[in-house]
Swiss-Prot record:
It catalyses: uroporphyrinogen III + 4 H(+) = coproporphyrinogen III + 4 CO2. Signal peptide: none annotated. It is found in: Cytoplasm. Substrate binds at residues 27-31, 77, 154, 209, 327. The gene is hemE. Its EC number is 4.1.1.37. Its main location: cytoplasm. This is Uroporphyrinogen decarboxylase. One of its GO terms (molecular function) is uroporphyrinogen decarboxylase activity. Pathway: Porphyrin-containing compound metabolism; protoporphyrin-IX biosynthesis; coproporphyrinogen-III from 5-aminolevulinate: step 4/4. The keyword Cytoplasm applies. CDD domains: URO-D (cd00717). Disulfide bonds: none annotated. Pfam families: URO-D.
Length: 357
């Protein structure tokens, strides 16, 4: 594997000195880029794009050709594991992801296989290997998975949900069934992420998109407990370097201390959290990633720059901050605005790291 030329993203996650604050964007390979739309059209649909090694590699690299980003993230979907378990993932226009055979009972859960990452999910590992090779050591590659709780919400609801009544019904009336599902998912995620690391992923992110819909007690029991199990089961060093792990619970600002206690290296913050407050609470234990409101990218570049300056000042001096949006970039954002955002982070963050030169 090529020697890493720009490692500031990995260094910041491990709270080691950096020259400027590193930056990448959730969903940086996506529909806001015209070249992505062309490649997706070529693939036919989203799932075919994920499963085509060459095209998944191409869309991963597209934002890096445009912008001086400090990391690449594997182009894939969080629902690859439930799909590999046989639930039949498909996408309904305007509806988002759906499953042909959602989970309805304890029997359904008992029958679920734990997918082999090099077999049913081999297409993901092929993409990781191809992307890692194509990056030529320019920037690190982030691998990822959905959290067990978030995967379970889609598997039980049958797709996206607003009220989460089906999974909450199981959680409160058949908790042992839900725990069995979450345990199977945690085991599957450990295998899946470790396979990504062996294939070349240099950092790992766990997306807990729906943890924020839970009460504090239920979050600990049904979401965080299983992310903790995953953190404990991951390969944390590969190719002579540490492999940092970031946990991101959207709506999880109340639980940063508990999240930091899992042994992860960093926490992703959504835009509803004050980064200064977050650093005060957990900055001595973990790095922080985030957390500009993705909708700020609709604003004129001067306003974007102002927001970047505010967030940098909120975090303050020194390392331990990876700049990002608080969630994925919206599909109708002008690419030039994303470029202005990335440039502003690098330019304006220099003074915060001067003691490190």
């Amino acid at each position: 594997m090529s020697e890493l030329k720009n490692d500031r993203y990995l260094r910041a996650l491990l709270r080691q000195p950096v020259d400027v604050t590193p930056v990448w964007m959730m969903r940086q390979a996506g529909r806001y880029l015209p070249e992505y739309k062309e490649t997706r059209a070529q693939a036919g649909d989203f799932i075919s794009l994920c499963k085509n090694t060459e095209l998944a590699c191409e869309v991963t690299l597209q934002p890096l050709r445009r912008f001086p980003l400090d990391a690449a993230i594997l182009f894939s979907d969080i629902l690859t594991i439930p799909d590999a378990m046989g639930l039949g993932l498909y996408f309904e226009t305007g509806e988002g992801p759906r499953f042909k055979t959602p989970i309805n009972s304890l029997d359904d859960i008992k029958k679920l296989p734990i997918p082999d990452p090099e077999d049913e999910l081999g297409y993901v590992m092929n993409a990781v290997r191809a992307i890692r090779h194509a990056l030529q050591g320019n920037v690190p590659l982030i691998g990822f998975s959905g959290s067990p709780w978030t995967l379970a919400t889609y598997m039980i609801e049958g797709g996206s949900s607003k009220a989460f009544t089906k999974i909450k019904k199981m959680m409160y009336s058949e908790p042992q069934a839900l725990h069995l599902l979450l345990d199977k998912l945690a085991d599957s995620v450990i295998l899946y992420l470790n396979a990504q690391i062996k294939a070349g992923a240099q950092s790992i992110m766990i997306f807990d998109t729906w943890g924020g819909v839970l009460t504090g007690r239920d979050y600990q029991l049904f979401s965080l407990q299983y992310m903790h199990k995953i953190v404990d089961g991951l390969i944390r060093e590969n190719e002579g370097r540490k492999v940092p792990v970031t946990l991101f619970t959207k709506g999880g600002g109340r639980w940063l201390e508990a999240m930091a206690a899992t042994g992860c290296d960093a926490l992703g913050l959504d835009w509803t959290i004050d980064i200064e407050d977050a650093r005060r609470r957990v900055g001595d234990k973990v790095a922080l990633q985030g957390n500009m409101d993705p909708s700020m990218l609709y604003a004129p570049p001067a306003r974007i720059e102002q927001e970047v300056a505010t967030i940098l000042a909120g975090f303050g001096k020194g390392t331990g901050h990876v700049f990002n949006l608080g969630h994925g970039i919206h599909q109708d954002v002008p690419p030039a605005h994303a470029g202005a955002f990335i440039d502003a982070v690098h330019r304006l963050s220099k003074p915060y790291h001067q003691d490190n030169d």
